[in-house]
């Protein structure tokens, strides 16, 4: 699995925000935490989607680079090719979406946190189904859950730039349900879970679309009251990892 940091973040920060080593040791998976290159403001970033933060021809081809990271891991390690994933936070979550658009041939699933796909759902259509777990706080002021103006300005992208408009989490989910031909909204057996360690009780509602024919799932974990930075603990991280491992190619 790739684990991708957000804008201004780096691999060390991401590893502290969502540590995976103990789960990797327990469950026997490998993960890569690459670093994005620096932009003109000296902040690390990913050239992801038109919302955050790309795609731009004058920036590095991060999609190609991350595919090379995956291919390199396959050559060096014993990898279950049916269980290759991408996970990211914020700009890294958008980059996970970009990877699913571009590399649906190899990715089984993605788990973007507070990320977003292309604003125009017809800009790029993935060739193969990819399971999607989108996680988003309803109180996110940086990447608004319901869409609208983007609170962050990155290399000239700002709320005054139409390309910076945020696609709402539910609209984004429905786009991927359409890509995957997940026409059936299914009532999950477990409707709510506890995700954010600072919120009381079962703070997260699950919305799920299924395609029983190709066994593809598109799911939204809507964390009520959480901001841009969901506060994780060992158990909530385990829920995300278990979801990914339960959704092979």
Model-derived segments and spans:
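Primarily recognizes the serine-hydrolase "nucleophile elbow" in alpha/beta-hydrolase
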Residues: 74-130, 141
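Short beta-strand/loop motif that positions the catalytic acidic residue
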Residues: 134-136, 140
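Serine-hydrolase catalytic machinery in alpha/beta-hydrolase-like enzymes
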Residues: 1-85, 95-98, 102, 146, ...
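Acidic, glycine-rich loop-and-strand cores that form catalytic or ligand-binding grooves
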Residues: 160-200
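Catalytic active-site module of serine/aspartate enzymes centered on a nucleophile-bearing elbow/loop
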Residues: 235-249
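A solvent-exposed, charged loop/short amphipathic helix patch at secondary-structure junctions
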Residues: 143-164
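Acidic catalytic loop of the alpha/beta-hydrolase fold
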Residues: 140-143, 227-230
């Amino acid at each position: 699995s790739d684990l991708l940091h957000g804008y201004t973040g780096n691999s060390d920060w991401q590893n502290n925000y969502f540590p995976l080593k103990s789960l990797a040791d327990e469950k026997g998976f490998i993960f890569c935490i690459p670093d994005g290159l620096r932009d003109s403001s000296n902040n690390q970033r990913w050239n992801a989607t038109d919302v955050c933060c790309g795609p731009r021809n004058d920036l590095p081809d991060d999609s190609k680079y991350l595919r090379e990271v995956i291919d390199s891991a396959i050559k060096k390690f014993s990898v279950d090719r049916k269980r290759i994933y991408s996970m990211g936070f914020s700009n890294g979550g958008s980059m996970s979406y970009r990877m699913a658009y571009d590399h649906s041939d190899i990715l089984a699933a993605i788990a973007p946190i507070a990320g977003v796909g292309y604003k125009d759902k017809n800009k790029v259509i993935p060739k193969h189904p990819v399971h999607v777990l989108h996680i988003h706080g309803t109180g996110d002021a940086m990447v608004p859950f319901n869409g609208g103006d983007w609170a962050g300005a990155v290399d000239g992208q700002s709320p005054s730039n139409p390309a910076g408009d945020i696609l709402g989490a539910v609209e984004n989910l429905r786009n991927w349900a359409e890509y995957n031909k997940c026409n059936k909204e299914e009532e999950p057996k477990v409707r709510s879970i506890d995700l954010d360690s600072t919120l009381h009780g079962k703070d997260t509602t699950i919305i799920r679309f299924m395609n029983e024919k190709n066994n593809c799932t598109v799911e939204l974990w809507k964390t009520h009251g959480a901001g841009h930075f969901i506060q994780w603990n060992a158990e909530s991280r385990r829920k995300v990892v278990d979801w990914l491992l339960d959704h092979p190619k």
